Amino acid sequence: MTAIIDIVGREILDSRGNPTVEVDVVLEDGSFGRAAVPSGASTGAHEAVELRDGGSRYLGKGVEKAVEVVNGKIFDAIAGMDAESQLLIDQTLIDLDGSANKGNLGANAILGVSLAVAKAAAQASGLPLYRYVGGTNAHVLPVPMMNIINGGAHADNPIDFQEFMILPVGATSIREAVRYGSEVFHTLKKRLKDAGHNTNVGDEGGFAPNLKNAQAALDFIMESIEKAGFKPGEDIALGLDCAATEFFKDGNYVYEGERKTRDPKAQAKYLAKLASDYPIVTIEDGMAEDDWEGWKYLTDLIGNKCQLVGDDLFVTNSARLRDGIRLGVANSILVKVNQIGSLSETLDAVETAHKAGYTAVMSHRSGETEDSTIADLAVATNCGQIKTGSLARSDRTAKYNQLIRIEEELDKQARYAGRSALKLL
């Protein structure tokens, strides 16, 4: 009854107007699953590889080759398999690809099928996706990390850090957390506008004002939190995504916007000072992806009082995460399904983190779609934290809206993670 009888891949557009892969999976009993694959702007060197067409069509970014793989090689390999055998299906696709980075079939082709299979199996079982994947204990609604000021690769401004985020740690529900975020977002918009700044939004729905440095961005956010009637650090904490790999050159961190250069120790001390001066509770990619010594120094410096999240460092890869755990580097992993390229490997990364006492943060990409799968996965894994952009653009709000629905469905079983999500608070 849950055998796979049809798989259809197609080329659609993501939130940046670039092509991406969407996959439909149909089971013998008529159950159906659909998944669309996200794509990043600042990508780690160790990520699984997307299959793109090259050439002039869509300026080389077309995904017709990946769609052809879905409709051909992948369908031939898993047609007739039981959709409830997720691990076996994912392993079959990994083996079929045969490379270390999914570069043959393409992580975008494999992931689209992997997620669509899970959705079809969930429908066949009569369960919502979060319950099908997570079981009866899936009940924790994550604290959102809301990216309300953009810089770096996500914006055309002098700010070197990529994201400035607010975390409604003092809210009592996801519904209330979204309200907190929305009120601060709109207050910030007015304050930026009054100060003469542009209030257009970037890839992830945050503002991209022409500010001189990180402190200026943090000051605007702090003022907006207070103006909206909240207490910084108590109701709403702050977070950074430095995306430091993007400005790591020849062993140093080159801040072109500030016209400053910091060596790894100076970079770590700078982040420590920011975390001391502001209620910053989480810093993502504070050091570059291959600057393991810098990461170790930063972790030893502030890892006991600040969540240090590895994104480009770990790329949702359990093997790299285990290296980090062994070396005592970072204390959290960012989880992006397309970095590793299958649902099973994504879940394995979260489990590996939790077993080692590391936290895990479910995350979107800057190129998103209306697909809200990561909202379900955040609840399924009880990871307690999610990054899915600002409070604007429907590709971002789709995930918040899905979390609100899940909370409503769970009713009294639902628990908003709040401060407990960040073990150091």
UniProtKB/Swiss-Prot annotation:
Pfam families: Enolase_C, Enolase_N. SMART domains: Enolase_C (SM01192), Enolase_N (SM01193). It is an enzyme of class 4 (lyase). It comes from the Bacteria. Its cofactor is Mg(2+). PROSITE patterns: ENOLASE (PS00164). (2R)-2-phosphoglycerate binds at residues 162, 336, 365-366, 387. It is found in: Cytoplasm; Secreted; Cell surface. It catalyses: (2R)-2-phosphoglycerate = phosphoenolpyruvate + H2O. The active site is at 204 (proton donor), 336 (proton acceptor). Mg(2+) binds at residues 241, 284, 311. Binds a second Mg(2+) ion via substrate during catalysis. GO terms for biological process: glycolytic process. Pathway: Carbohydrate degradation; glycolysis; pyruvate from D-glyceraldehyde 3-phosphate: step 4/5. GO terms for cellular component: cell surface; extracellular region; phosphopyruvate hydratase complex. Belongs to the enolase family. Catalyzes the reversible conversion of 2-phosphoglycerate (2-PG) into phosphoenolpyruvate (PEP). It is essential for the degradation of carbohydrates via glycolysis. This is Enolase. It comes from Brucella melitensis biotype 2 (strain ATCC 23457).
